[in-house]
Amino acid sequence: MYYSAGTYEAFARPEKPEGADRKSAYIVGTGLAGLAAAFYLVRDGQVKGERIHLLEKLDLAGGSCDGRKDVRKGFYMRGGREMDNHFECMWDMFRDVPSIETPGVSVLDEYYWLNKHDPNYSLCRASEKCGQDAHTDKKFTLDKDSALALSKLFMTPEKDLEDKKISEVLPDSFWDTNFWLYWQTMFAFQRWSSALEMKRYLCRYCHHIDGLPDFSALRFTKYNQYESMILPLVKYLESHGVSVEYGMDVKNVVIKDENGKKTATQIVYEKDGKPGTIDLIEDDLVFITNGCCTDTSCYGDQNTAPDLSQIKNGAGESWDLWKNIAAQAKNGEYGNPDKFCDDFEATNWMSATVETSDEEIIQKIISICKRDPREGKVTTGGIVTVKDSTDNWYLSWTINRQPQFKAQDKNTVLIWVYALTTNKEGNYVKKAMRDCTGEEVCREWLYHIGVPTDQIDDWAKNRCNTTTCFMPYINAFFQPRKESDRPLVVPEGAVNFAFLGQFAETPRDTIFTTEYSIRTGMEAVYTLMNVDRGVPEVWGSKYDVRELLRAAYYAVDKKPIDELPLSLKEKIVLKQVIKAVEGTDLEILLKESGLLR
């Protein structure tokens, strides 16, 4: 497996790999990573679909990319997906997955046209004082110490950031900046999250820094992630003969290690309460989704809070599988699951889905986001963060294009609400969010959009229906880590198995993205099948001086360098640098970026 960039490799079709007709594949998990592995086995590995078996414990494919309607309780959306135009592996896949809505076009075509006709951007990034615009005004408000610390983090080698928290590498002044408000709520970082992962994010998305304050960097699907991404992909695979075996609870993959040659020899599972095994030979490939950020999710509804009584650190079926595999390693080569799942108080947050068709509530929404959600276009353009809830629930909410579900009633609006802090009282509801019913969560949201306090309780009960989801491990992959804590996609010496998803290690890319999952699936197949075509490298904006200069300009709130708060010594050095680059291409680049007048 090798990386590539450019259209030569991107447009080419690989030859059929040697031995493809002898291969069979078993894929544990039908999240985006597992489905992507199946896709690449079919398209580029050219393995017959009938020889590819997806093993899924649940009765529905998609993993964390879900979206569903419970006929008794209402709509559930655990989360949403923010996409980037440089998700190279994602678009490589979806350009060949047919749309299930528009005949003759791909999912990528459909998505591309949608976001051209209806580009995403926010008209109110944050609110305060019960629905008033907080006027972040696209500014980052970085002080000098914070800006320098971010620059240093950008350039620090990953090895030097292992097991470090963000709070260990950034100054206290950073937490009061708009940059941190945008960053934390957009990506769900916490102060105790991995400094290594934050560095990856800075490097990965420096070309989008101008689009962070108003979300103009983002693109979204037409419907929820299940209907827009998972369903077309599953239908593509089924059309090629790939089978999805539901109710398969995989407990272990037995791996034999003989002098460094590692071979998966057996899959151990339960189905319908009965144990079973699948014996494997070297031509049987096994793709393992190790760990899951939505493991042991707990659901609530309008009248019931989520039941958290069964949540225990380290407990969860995906973690149990990974632990069973990791225990077989001789040198820790299958990762360290405990690093990610041993402190759910550090890794949880909670979301809610509010359903309403009430005109007065919708008018409150319109007053904040300046758009009518019933028009079927971008509404909030990303989350609206409630700035004065930072010491309480730290609430944000968003309305994506409506309807979010094809089954949604006309003129009904679905609002997705999430909170980074679940163990503190709300501003209005004097309970921790995790202890609240859907109705109580709705009250807090209604308060923050400006509903009069004497009407909040009635409106939450009679004009809305709210479901909730507490996810104990949703931020597990943000825990401080070493490179060795996640297994390589294909561990050294592995003959017929690979790891997939957010807890597999691949260079430079960032977790909590659709791209990361798909990339691991592609890399796994290309490595084990020896597909002779390049895997698209992570977009290289961190190596592009134009993007770096532009990022610097926006990070200092679009000030030329002669307006920055510099010391006398720094001003003298700057003057010398400007003189040295005079008449060169670098001077042109500095002027084009805005840093030089």
Q: Language-model segments: which ranges?
A:
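Extreme N-terminal leader/targeting segments of oxidoreductases
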Residues: 1-25, 43-51, 555-563, 567-597
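Rossmann-like flavin
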Residues: 100-207, 219-220
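A short, Lys/Arg-enriched amphipathic alpha-helix followed by its capping loop at the start of a domain
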Residues: 37-50, 236, 240
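Glycine-rich Rossmann-fold phosphate-binding loop(s) that bind the pyrophosphate
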Residues: 29-35
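Helical element adjacent to the flavin cofactor pocket in flavoenzyme catalytic cores
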Residues: 203-285, 289-291, 303-304, 309-311, ...
